Structure formats: C-alpha cells, structure tokens
Amino acid sequence: MCGIVGVVGNTNATDILIQGLEKLEYRGYDSAGIFVVGDNKSQLVKSVGRIAELQAKVGDSVSGTTGIGHTRWATHGKPTEGNAHPHTSGSGRFVLVHNGVIENYLQIKETYLTKHNLKGETDTEIAIHLVEHFVEEDNLSVLEAFKKALHIIEGSYAFALIDSQDADTIYVAKNKSPLLIGLGNGYNMVCSDAMAMIRETSEYMEIHDKELVIVKKDSVEVQDYDGNVIERGSYTAELDLSDIGKGTYPFYMLKEIDEQPTVMRKLISTYANESGDMNVDSDIIKSVQEADRLYILAAGTSYHAGFAAKTMIEKLTDTPVELGVSSEWGYNMPLLSKKPMFILLSQSGETADSRQVLVKANEMGIPSLTITNVPGSTLSREATYTMLIHAGPEIAVASTKAYTAQVATLAFLAKAVGEANGKAEAKDFDLVHELSIVAQSIEATLSEKDVISEKVEQLLISTRNAFYIGRGNDYYVTMEAALKLKEISYIQTEGFAAGELKHGTISLIEDNTPVIALISADSTIAAHTRGNIQEVVSRGANALIIVEEGLEREGDDIIVNKVHPFLSAISMVIPTQLIAYYASLQRGLDVDKPRNLAKAVTVE
C-alpha cells in the first residue's frame, strides 16, 4: 500500500523517480506525485490516476538532482490531487512523502498547529507542518525539528523529507512501515521496495524502526531519534531486471501462473540435497519439535495456503495446527497451548497485521517462523527463524505463485520435522519425487489454457455471482479460488464446504447460477461431492467440474493430473487461477491492478 522513492545527487532525478514509481505500481495506488529540486529551482507535480498520467503532466519540464516521489493509496482523505503526495509546508519550504497512518494527528493539530493553514484532509499534512512549526517557532535546524516531530508522532510511518533550500539531503525515518536505502556511486536512494531501485543499484541498507537516516549523494548516516549514530552494513539483493518485466506476456499474473513449475523445482533444489534428503535448518526443526501446537497466522491468500497445508503438517509431524487471521489475533489473542510456536505466512514479509501478531509473540517469548518471499523484510528480521519461498518477484496484485510456493515450503518443513520425529509416514513421503510430479501436473494444466478460457466465457462472462464447492483439501482450495475470482473479476464469489450446501447456501442457487466443483479426494468423498453437484444442477445451476485424474466421469470439464494427496491443493488451484484470469480478461478489466486493492498491506 503506497510507495516511496527518492534520489539525491543524480542529474537524472525525474526519470529515476518516474521509473521507480512505475515499479511500485503493483503495491496499489490511486494518485501519485513527485517533487524535484536542483539549480536553485524546484517543481511539484501531482495527479490522480495512473503513473502514465503523472508522466504526461511532468513532460520534459521538470528537472533536478534530488527528488522524492510517491504513490498514494487513500486512507485519510479522498483520492484527489490535493491529498496526493508529496505535501508541502505552509511556506512551501519543506516537502514530505509518507506511508502509514499517524494515529495522533488530531491531537497534534490541536496542540501545535492551530495557527497553520491546513489545506488537505490527510494525516501526512500534519507531519510536514509540525516540522516547519519547530523550525520557525523553536528556531531549530531541520534535523532537530524532524527529530522533535518524530518523538511526538505516533503510529506507523515511513517518511522522506526534503528542505527545498538544501538540494543535497533527504531526511528519512520509519516505524512499522517498510523503507530501504539504495547505495549508488555519486548518488543514493530511498525506497519502499528494492524492486523500484533495481536499475540503479543492487546494494541496499536496512532501516529499522524508530531510526532516522540522513541521505546525501556521497554518504548515509543512521541515527536513533536522540541523535546517537548507528553503524549499519549493506547487503546485495539478488534481483534481475528480467524478473520484474512482463516479457512477452500481456499481464504479470499470466506470467506468474506460468512460472509455477519453475518455482516448484527451485524449491526442490533449495530444500533438498542431491540424495533427496531434506535441507531445512536444524534449529527450525528442533523448535517445531519442541512445540505442542503450531499456530499459522496469515492474511488473504497466505491464510488459505496455511489451511491447504494444515492436514499434511499434522499427519507428518503429529503436531496439532491451528489457523488464525492475523488482523484478529493482533488484538484478540486466544488461549494458547503451553508450548506454542507461531508460523507467519506473508508473501511480502511486510503485512502489518501479521507484524502486530509477531510483536506480541516476541513480547511473550513465543518462538516464531516467518515464511516469506522477501529476504530482509520486516517479518523475516523480527521472527526467530525464516524460510524463503523463492518464488521470485510477484508483481500482480492477485497472488498465484506465492500461494503454491508457501504450500510447498510448508511441505518441506513438515517432512523434515516428521523424519526427525521418526514418523514412518514422513520417511515414506518422497517429497522430491512427488513435487516433481506436481510441477508436471501444473504444466499439463497450463497446456489447456484455451479450453479453460472457453469454459469461462460460457459460464462467467455475464454473471454477478458464483460459487466454488469442495470437500477436504478441495474445500480449502475453494476459499482461495473464490478470493482470486472476486478480487480481479469483481464477481461476488463464495467458496464453501460442499456438505454445507443444505445448511443454508443452497437457497442462493437459481437458474444459471455458476457453481464450480473441485474433486480430488478418494472415490467415497468424490461421490458425496457429485451428489452435491446434482443438488445444485437440479435447482438450475450451471456446473463446471474440475476433477483429478482417475475420478473423472463423462462430461467433466477440466481434468487435473493426479498427484500425492498432501500436494493436491497445489495442482487443483492452478485451473482456478486461470479461471480468475480469463474471467477478468474477458470482462475487459485490468488483471494486474484490480480496483481498491494493494499488493502489500502495510497499514492495519
């Protein structure tokens, strides 16, 4: 949600800012803007809508050596040019961009800013006026005024501040919102995400919560809010320009769906050696062994991935697994077992709700494992342990390959722990072989895109509602399938256990209601699901059946190659991802950037 990019000391600041904002589009936004300063002149340009509209307004007229840019996803105030960032102080001297939510902005306004002319509706405007207030009223330097403001401001934030009288410095601070420093040769950068700086640098420096950074073209100094200097090393990010481009694909989502077989094979090479033995950190294995219950905490697609792996983990490790929605657990922690362990699933590693849970876990001394796609992310830094899903950059808002990679990574964890526990079922589960079969199954499904596209056009082109049904692991897949379809096609979709039809939901079935059924369990469960299909068809529903090989009947629509039951949630989700993609495409929607959604939810 929202994105920041800044550069100091480069003659090409405007182009770098625009290119950086384009790389941050996937995070979600409704307006954007840049501020550029240099050669004793400065310019501020903002627009509502896409980056292309901002770029058209900028044209060739905006130039400078230092600047900050921002994509805004509205939280306080409507998406207007006035509320778009960057924001200026009353005199226009100070310019600020901000991600996050200032919780005490009304108190600050009433205490310090009664004489200030506040023009917008945002909490960000409060912050920049507060800095100017301390410069003018307390006669403080910009740095000291910024520090004083940071001591007062409460909430989540990532700030980048420029004094238009000083074209050589960007002041940066963060708390609970992601922000990185990019180190260049004769210039330095600041950004919410390393991907926005990939063209300019591969060397980065982390900023921890409640740290202030003074960024100049040839130096970066990290301080705490009391002015104590903090030594901080840098690291190199393993990113490639080809990873963040669409290539020949029309949309990132389709590219990322197609990348899933490669991701499965990457995980095999990461978490298993050439002999097929598990290559999972022994400290992680020991910590899971010592737990009497595992709590998987996540949001959205990651939450569904946790459900998809729950039964497998329990059967392979003999350890009970409980699922929790991070946004609920952050404020309503239930009664826990005596020796709990938290597993946090997050593609970005920056999910604010999950971080709130992790903060509480750390306070309680509960061991934690983050499973994420982003090394160096907040959750990976603050958890006891981390496992990476190695899915590569996921740009489309609708997550696909991160889901399947999370399930596969949990499979490696479960097998490793089960073997350490001496479980015969874990030892007999040839995960390397079975996951290779999954990769082949995915490839087979991907070869049927034209068939799936035609089925979608017949079933979903004009509908307003749809249902997914399934039993066992298929039920867990229906939840993810429904989320995918609703978030990018805007079709109101519900996924539920097929056996629950008669307990209420069947009342919504009418003529031509689309019902998509998943069948991958054993023949007995499959027979029950087919009975449920007949119930909805007899009431006028149009049914589409996705069935695993060996359970198919004449008239079934999509056949998925058979895989090990522990991994069926991976193979069965692939056709549902394609269904969502084609439903969105055929409705003329922006597949990669659905309305009102952000890729990384970094505010609560």
UniProtKB/Swiss-Prot annotation:
Gene3D superfamilies: Glucose-6-phosphate isomerase like protein, domain 1, Glutamine Phosphoribosylpyrophosphate, subunit 1, domain 1. This is Glutamine--fructose-6-phosphate aminotransferase [isomerizing]. The active site is at 2 (nucleophile), 599 (for fru-6p isomerization activity). GO terms for molecular function: carbohydrate derivative binding; glutamine-fructose-6-phosphate transaminase (isomerizing) activity. Catalyzes the first step in hexosamine metabolism, converting fructose-6P into glucosamine-6P using glutamine as a nitrogen source. Residues 284-423, 456-594 form the SIS domain. Residues 2-218 form the Glutamine amidotransferase type-2 domain. One of its GO terms (cellular component) is cytosol.
